[in-house]
Every structure is written in C-alpha cells, then in structure tokens.
Amino acid sequence: MKKFHHLGLITHTAVSGEVWYDSLKVWGTNPDDDPNRIEWVRFAPASPLAETPVAKMPHISWAVDDLDQELQGKQLVVGPLQAAPGVRIAYFFLDGALVEYLEVK
C-alpha cells in the first residue's frame, strides 16, 4: 500500500527546523511539522546524492510497506539507501516526475 508522505523541495540556504542526516550528508526538515507536508532538503557537497537528480529537482514521496516489493520493475535513479535508522528510501522517475518510495520499520 502507498500513502502520500511529502513533497521534497531543494534549497541552497538554511531553513528553520532543519536537521543533519549524516548518512546522506544532507540537512532536511520534517514534513510532519509542515501543514502541506513539505520537506526542505539541502545537500552538502560531500553528499552521495549531490550529483544525482535527487539534489537537482523536487520529488514526491510515498510511504510504502515493503520497499523491495514496490521497487520491482522500476528503473532506479538512486537506492535503496538507509536514510536513517529504520528508514530506507529509493528514487525513480515516473512519467518525468522524480518519485521517492520510503519504508519505515
């Protein structure tokens, strides 16, 4: 089952409420704190995602129960990656839009 999780937008300046995710070398806000479920993301130059489409364009994120199952048949741009303890993510294009699937265990 897929459920809308957030809209990820790129920023190049610090945003109030952002936290550091060391595993990905990014700063990000929590979409749970935004009424429109927006996640602001800022990439450090050393981020493994810095030179990928993930760091260059917005994405729509869907929470999924089983990431591996949902990714079957998808041509991945990035991932799957361990974003945080218990959180796995992967990105792919769907009709020209960048999509993130996110699994929380």
Language model features with spans:
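Core segments of cupin and vicinal oxygen chelate
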Residues: 1-46, 69-75, 80-95
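Short cationic amphipathic helices and targeting signals
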Residues: 5-9, 58-63
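Short low-complexity stretches enriched in small and charged residues
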Residues: 12-21, 49-50, 54-59, 104
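Short, conserved turn/kink motifs that form compact alpha/beta structural patches or helix kinks used as
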Residues: 37-57, 63
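Short, Lys/Arg-rich amphipathic alpha-helical interaction segments
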Residues: 94, 98-105
